[in-house]
């Protein structure tokens, strides 16, 4: 099975359709404070690379959340649409937005050292600390 595929999805109200041509099947959970504050818990998302398009782009608002990334949301229903690395133009999109989720595999946990102690996932995953994540992504 390929690690990437084409995926389609939408926001909660349907005002925005997502087309990701290189959607990874590997789901990652981010436990950083920003993601938990943004969504009320860990962000469960997939890397979609740069080949992503949206129908209904006029309904997308973007929040500049750090020096290296921004977050998009539907300005009609509030659905979280993406976390985008600015320089790479790389999209990380919440997996729950996609129509077909059966091929996803839970693979990574980011900012594992920031995860609150009141929850944990049973899946065996590749875990990265805050320092490891920042070293890999913040400078790019």
Where do the protein language model's features map onto the residues?
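A short Gly-Trp-Pro
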Residues: 1-140
């Amino acid at each position: 099975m390929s690690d990437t595929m084409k995926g389609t999805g939408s926001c909660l109200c349907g005002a925005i359709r997502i087309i990701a041509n290189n959607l990874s099947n590997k789901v990652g959970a981010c436990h950083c404070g920003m993601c938990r504050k943004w969504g009320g818990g860990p962000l469960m998302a997939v890397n979609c690379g740069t080949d992503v398009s949206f129908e209904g782009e006029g309904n997308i608002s973007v929040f500049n959340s750090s020096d290296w990334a921004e977050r998009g949301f539907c300005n009609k229903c509030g659905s979280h649409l993406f976390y985008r690395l600015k320089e790479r133009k790389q999209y990380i999109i919440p997996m729950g937005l996609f129509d077909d989720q059966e091929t996803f595999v839970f693979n990574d946990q980011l900012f594992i050292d920031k995860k609150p102690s009141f929850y944990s996932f049973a899946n065996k995953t590749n875990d990265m600390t805050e320092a490891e994540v920042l070293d890999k992504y913040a400078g790019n």
